[in-house]
Amino acid sequence: MAFASEDIAYHSSNAVYRVPSNRHEADQEALLGKPLDYPAPGLQRPEDRFNGAYIIFFCLGIGGLLPWNFFVTAKEYWAFKLRNCSSPASGKDPEDADILNYFESYLAVASTVPSLLFLVANFLLVNRIRVHVRVLASLSVSLAIFVVMAVLVRVDTSSWTRGFFSIAMACMAIISSSSTIFNSSVYGLTGSFPMRNAQALISGGAMGGTVSAVASLVDLAASSDVRDSALAFFLTAAVFLGLCVGLYLLLPQLEYARYYMRPVVPIHVFSSEDSPPRDAPSTSSVAPASRAVHTPPLGPILKKTAGLGFCAVFLYFITALIFPAISTNIQPMHKGTGSPWTSKFYVPLTVFLLFNFADLCGRQVTAWIQVPGPRSKLLPILAVSRVCLVPLFLLCNYQPRSHLTLVLFQSDIYPILFTCLLGLSNGYLSTLVLMYGPKIVPRELAEATSVVMLFYMSLGLMLGSACAALLEHFI
């Protein structure tokens, strides 16, 4: 994929984003009024030869979300492991039935709550622990957890399903925490790069979901044992996490990456009208240790990103409210026919694969089109308009349902169309928001701002997951 003059158009805090029409002149202004990036004397901006950095960030994006996606898409495996909790009529505590029936909601809560807490921790650690340490440590923890889950695949847990459920939730919480540290650290790193690299990382996350959904379909078709499928999931995730370690270690070897990863000036909050002091020190003279004593200024970052933050929270709130808790429980209208389409492949194909592929397409479009801009009033309007998707999904054939009995959309094509719309809108709008965030602040605050943007995202996911768990009980 060719990106002409990306170092000029997408450069750090002075990026001028591209739009296809002059009708949006207000959105074509520079994201910051004054240059805030000080190139080291004698250095010229190198080119990303063979798109090496772009490919690495794309792969790191896959590795960042692949663990969570493999956990979620292994629905048949969790149902198999928790099968003793499927019916309260079997003499089990009625609470056991909730473990299986609402497993996706519990999984989402176990994922989003620790994620939110560790984003706060990562914000405090931005200038205290090197990004190199945070990235490698988080990858190592995720790798260890997947090894544990792979071992548990062959362990008979039928006599202690509640214990296994607790272990699964704990593993999900640890995976989510380590993935949060990894994602926010790498995303913060891209804040110092041209904007196309952030787009690569974010699109890679959607590719991770697509890869896991395809793997789920292949395993369902090739294997009759859900344990074999789960083992393949977990081992694949472990291998890819190991690959991410190697790719991250390779990144600083690229001249292009070294240029943008060089130290920056100490934190000083500039306004969009301020000019940097003429005697500002060059980046090459700043000792890395000088950053260790500073905590990024939260107030100015929150003020600068308030509008984008609202969009991020609302976008991910609606997405988490629907996917996966609601959408995975929409059943085909002719489920009892015995067809593999209605019994085996419907949810993996029409929910996980379709949503993740649509999400990927939406994110990839932002490589060429960035409309509306970060200051446009249209952006929050589009984000809020997605609330219309919630009743559309609820009026499909959601099961089980005891209060809302009306099924308005009595055809399988409707949830497919709604899922495409959910994925496309989530991918396109959320990528715009996440790309814009680190570009409306000085370069030295880009990493901290990236963490704040992911905090907004996780807050939306947590609220959406919690509301989805409540909504399921009222349908």
UniProtKB/Swiss-Prot annotation:
Reported tissue expression: Widely expressed. Highest levels in heart and liver (at protein level).
Topological region Cytoplasmic: 1-51, 127-132, 184-199, 252-305, 362-377, 438-450
Keyword vocabulary terms for this entry: Cell membrane, Endosome, Glycoprotein, Lysosome, Membrane, Mitochondrion, Phosphoprotein, Transmembrane, Transmembrane helix, Transport
InterPro entries listed in its UniProt record: Eqnu_transpt (IPR002259)
Segments traversing the membrane: 52-72, 106-126, 133-153, 163-183, 200-220, 231-251, 306-326, 341-361, 378-398, 415-437, 451-471
Dileucine internalization motif, short sequence motif: residues: 31-32
Entry's family note: Belongs to the SLC29A/ENT transporter (TC 2.A.57) family.
Name recorded for this polypeptide: Equilibrative nucleoside transporter 3
Lineage of origin: Eukaryota, Metazoa, Chordata, Craniata, Vertebrata
Gene that encodes it: Slc29a3
